């Protein structure tokens, strides 16, 4: 009797398929577009309310784009870590929007005050209009979708239950 012990089932697949990579790219692009819409909304508010933009805010904007760009890049390159990168990116983006615009960084630490200018306080304290709120909600929802999609793909990838 000759039994092979290290035989793996044929349906065990740890690599993401075309469908999963395509969905990760799509949600990353949607997230980047919503973030661009969000930043353009900041410019609209600056023009209407005569706020000033401090140069340090551009650093914050740059840092905010890094997770979504990384998630898109990993999906574009068809990396085995694309789902993990998408999950981390979604969490970072959701936390960033929540901390910056719902809680307000002035409640967390005065360190952020010089970086964020007028946006150191929450949206409610800024008396943001409906357009800004809808924009913020769209960004947070896209982050939640990125988290859920990436988590689903990552769990299926790690357990070998990925249907490609």
List the predicted regions and their residue ranges.
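Membrane-interface interhelical loops and short amphipathic "cap" helices
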Residues: 37-55, 110-124
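Individual transmembrane alpha-helices with interfacial aromatic-anchor signatures
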Residues: 119-145
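Core segments of alpha-helical transmembrane spans in multipass integral membrane proteins
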Residues: 33-35, 55-75
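Core segments of transmembrane alpha-helices
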Residues: 63-69, 139-146
């Amino acid at each position: 009797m000759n039994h092979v012990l290290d035989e793996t089932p044929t349906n065990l697949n740890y690599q993401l398929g075309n469908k999963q990579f395509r969905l990760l790219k799509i949600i990353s692009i949607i997230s980047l577009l919503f973030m661009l819409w969000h930043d353009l909304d900041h410019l609209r508010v600056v023009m209407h309310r005569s706020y000033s933009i401090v140069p340090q805010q551009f650093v914050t904007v740059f840092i905010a784009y890094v997770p979504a760009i990384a998630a898109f890049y990993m999906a574009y390159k068809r990396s085995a870590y694309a789902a993990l990168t998408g999950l981390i990116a979604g969490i970072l983006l959701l936390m960033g929007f929540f901390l910056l615009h719902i809680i307000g960084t002035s409640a967390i630490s005065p360190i952020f005050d010089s970086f964020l200018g007028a946006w150191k306080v929450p949206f409610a304290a800024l008396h943001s209009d409906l357009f800004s709120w809808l924009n913020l909600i769209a960004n947070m929802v896209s982050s939640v979708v990125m988290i859920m999609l990436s988590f689903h793909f990552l769990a299926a990838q790690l357990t070998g239950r990925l249907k490609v």
